[in-house]
Amino acid sequence: MAKTIGLLGKKLGMTRVFADDGSVVPVTVLEVGPCPVMQVKTEEKEGYNAIQIGYDALPERKVNKPAKGHQEKAGKGYFRHLREFPLESVADYELGQEISVDIFAAGEKVKVTGTSKGKGFQGVMKRWNFAGSRASHGAEKVHRSPGSIGHATFPGKVFKGKKMPGQMGNERVTVSNIEIVDVRADENVLVVKGQVPGPKNGLVMIRKTS
């Protein structure tokens, strides 16, 4: 995994923009940072280089004692979300330093990580894109069933990983090589091409690819 810097933000929603040739480009608008550096880890002390950043300010009354002791060291208040980014070098970062959206540039490719929308308990046709059984010609009450899920006496079990009905969504998803369309540093806004995981106001992590 590339050791690159990133930021935290939230998904504001989707819209569209028009390219120079007149084509319509669907985009997602993200509110990103600014994120203060809450901790700097060094190879000498912790065994690896990394920085920890904070996002989404919290009032002091909502922070427990251990979290308060940790976050007070940066002198930037308290935050709901903390994320760590392993880096090759931390020489350019110091405790309390604010990292803003201007570390990104239009045309750059990034990775976006979020929590996908929860869909609840779903069948195999929705969850795994199964074709289902026949609509008629002898098919009865099995139109959306998965069909066979294994063998007979041998091996006498259903193998692990078999695609079956179950909980769908509400899991960590990363989408790579998303192109940045626009960076609005004065508004802390990042406009990226296409869609990103999660609902409106959902937490997202944006990382550089190199």
UniProtKB/Swiss-Prot annotation:
Residues covered by region (Disordered): 139-165
Transmembrane feature ranges: none
UniProt-listed InterPro entries: Ribosomal_uL3 (IPR000597), Ribosomal_uL3_bac/org-type (IPR019927), Transl_B-barrel_sf (IPR009000)
GO (cellular component) term, any one: cytosolic large ribosomal subunit
Protein name: Large ribosomal subunit protein uL3
Protein role: One of the primary rRNA binding proteins, it binds directly near the 3'-end of the 23S rRNA, where it nucleates assembly of the 50S subunit.
Lineage: Bacteria, Pseudomonadati, Thermodesulfobacteriota, Desulfovibrionia, Desulfovibrionales
HAMAP family found in the cross-reference section: Ribosomal_uL3_B
Matching SUPFAM superfamilies: Translation proteins
Gene Ontology molecular function, alphabetical: rRNA binding; structural constituent of ribosome
